[in-house]
Amino acid sequence: MTVSNLPDALLLVAFGGPEGPVDVEPFLQNVTAGRDVPADRLAEVAQRYLSRGGKSPGNDRMRALLAAVQTELRSRDLVVPVVWGNRNWHPFIEETVEELERQGHQRVMAWFSSPYRSYSTCRQYLEQISAATEGCSVSVERLRPYFDHPGCIEPAADRLREALLTLPADLRDETCLLFSAHSLPLASADTCAYVDEINEAARLIAERVSPQGQHRWEVVWQSRSGSPHVPWLVPDVGDRIDELAGLGVQAVAVSPVGFPVGNFEVEWDLDVEAAQRAAAHGMSFARADTIDQDPRFAAMIVDLLVEHCTSGATPAALGNLGVAPAACPSHCCPPPP
């Protein structure tokens, strides 16, 4: 099989984050536009960012990933420019599309930093891309979701193994593995594949880290926002740590399975809040690193591009849910009610 019909460019699509203190408030206004987020909650989140210099680690992570993807493409003698666009901060998707048009690129493939399907991790990005390309010469197709791709699962398993090694030796075999992902309103979670895909990815990672089943493992949720009156996915990671301490669990290792690319929510909600909850119980705590800096992750992005452009290619997938389509069905991931 030969690679043919390569696109004019590859667009890496991400959430975005502030680059400094002056960016925090407008960034959060973008994130919460049209949502019922209490003002005190917004102020609380803003203070968290400001306490760490007002900068999200996500942008630097995406810059490094873009460079790694460029290197991987060159190693395969594939000539495809790589660009980057965010949903919520510069470079915005709209800005990147404008630049692509100025450069004469027409056919563009997009890779999403979240491998899971929900309105906020999938369709909302597609809607923004559609609006950005309306009336211009740039056409954007997305690469397929990759939640169970070996380039996603194997690095995550390695990062979790490394995290376990930082715990006291006498507690490692009894450590509870927690797989954390961004919570969603139940009304949204019930209309998409998000929860099933998170659970499948967690299972695949757990089976590699604990092949004999010696470790208990669970999926937990983090970073909920919005109205406190709206039910969201539970258990919250901090609440579950409290419950596990009451059950006598002495150590937890958290894999940020929902966040392949490092961001502020991982560093705050897990490294600060979840770690503090564990420390309050005298519980040993470790957090696995995200996988965006693993060379296999950048290689996976190029693999997905090559797969899309190669007639008869067999998709690489480890799970039991089937390969998700690149083009979402019209009924997939509807907007929240």
Question: What is the role of each PLM region?
Answer:
Residues 2-337:
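Active-site-proximal alpha-helix that buttresses catalytic centers in soluble enzyme cores
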